[in-house]
Swiss-Prot record:
Transmembrane segments: none annotated. This is ATP synthase gamma chain. Belongs to the ATPase gamma chain family. Gene3D superfamilies: 3.40.1380.10, ATP synthase, gamma subunit, helix hairpin domain. One of its GO terms (cellular component) is proton-transporting ATP synthase complex. Produces ATP from ADP in the presence of a proton gradient across the membrane. The gamma chain is believed to be important in regulating ATPase activity and the flow of protons through the CF(0) complex. It is a peripheral membrane protein. It comes from Shewanella piezotolerans (strain WP3 / JCM 13877). Pfam families: ATP-synt (PF00231). The lineage of its organism: Bacteria, Pseudomonadati, Pseudomonadota, Gammaproteobacteria, Alteromonadales. The gene is atpG.
Amino acid sequence: MANAKEIKTKIASVQNTQKITSAMEMVAASKMRKAQDRMASSRPYAENMRKVIGHVAQGSLEYKHPYLEVREAKRVGYIVVSTDRGLCGGLNVNLFKKVVADVKKQREAGAEVEFCPIGARSVQFFNSFGGQVSAHASGLGDAPSLTDLIGTVRVMLEAYNEGKLDRLYVVFNKFVNTMTQTPVIEQLLPLPKSEEDEISHHWDYLYEPDPKELLDTLLVRYVESQVYQGVVENIASEQAARMVAMKAATDNAGELISDLELVYNKARQAAITQELSEIVSGAAAV
């Protein structure tokens, strides 16, 4: 058994760690609320944009935009959104597992894949995973703007326009609630058709002044908005996961401190008992 001094040093060390994890929990809680506000403000735009684009994909247009054409999936691109930092539980691990499983299916079907990682953890993972990394972005911070992502996203869009990609997906952690964040893979290109209107009726629009000019701008903006929404959803998920992980670490530290204090008291009691025994033995010898 370690002596009382060593145990006391361990207790002090764990207490210092507990203070750090407790502070990180409070910081993550504050950042999560701000991230939730940003996510909630942009989510209606992204969802309604997806609905409108779904209706466009079902419409009968004289001008067929390349994003509306379904091609054989010979090469597939993934925009994978992760965190820049760790200490957020299994958030990134679960996301990467989902991507790897989907990539395996694509490769079994004979398709090649390339990646556009967003976030330091994603960049690090896919540089070692294997496969072409066409573009990447990291260090976006807790409040990224759309302009921070445009350059990276445009690289993948240009590859699609040139026929180098036949499918484009965005992968991120969707924020459900504080305790639940779900990794999702959403198809960006070709444009997914609206599921809710497939049975009831088809939508069509009148385009002024020119369908080509409008769609060229609208469809690019749609892809950018979906990627941006994925990023803000992932940030909210990151802060929620970090808050939960740091709370668990703080609670575990408290339990460890209690256990160490019990061991410390036993060691101290044993030392006192030994000293008393030595005193009694010495007195008896005299």
